[in-house]
Swiss-Prot record:
Its EC number is 3.2.1.14. It catalyses: Random endo-hydrolysis of N-acetyl-beta-D-glucosaminide (1->4)-beta-linkages in chitin and chitodextrins. It comes from Phaseolus vulgaris. It comes from the Eukaryota. The keyword rRNA-binding does not apply. Disulfide bonds: none annotated. The lineage of its organism: Eukaryota, Viridiplantae, Streptophyta, Embryophyta, Tracheophyta. This is Chitinolytic alpha-amylase inhibitor PvCAI. Keywords: Alpha-amylase inhibitor, Carbohydrate metabolism, Chitin degradation, Glycosidase, Hydrolase, Polysaccharide degradation. One of its GO terms (molecular function) is alpha-amylase inhibitor activity. Transmembrane segments: none annotated.
Amino acid sequence: HEDNAGIAVYWGQDAREGDLVTACN
């Protein structure tokens, strides 16, 4: 679960790029 929290933050930061947002979906 702790890993998920770290990933959430990671995706959140890169979400601005818009690239990883597509990968996350």
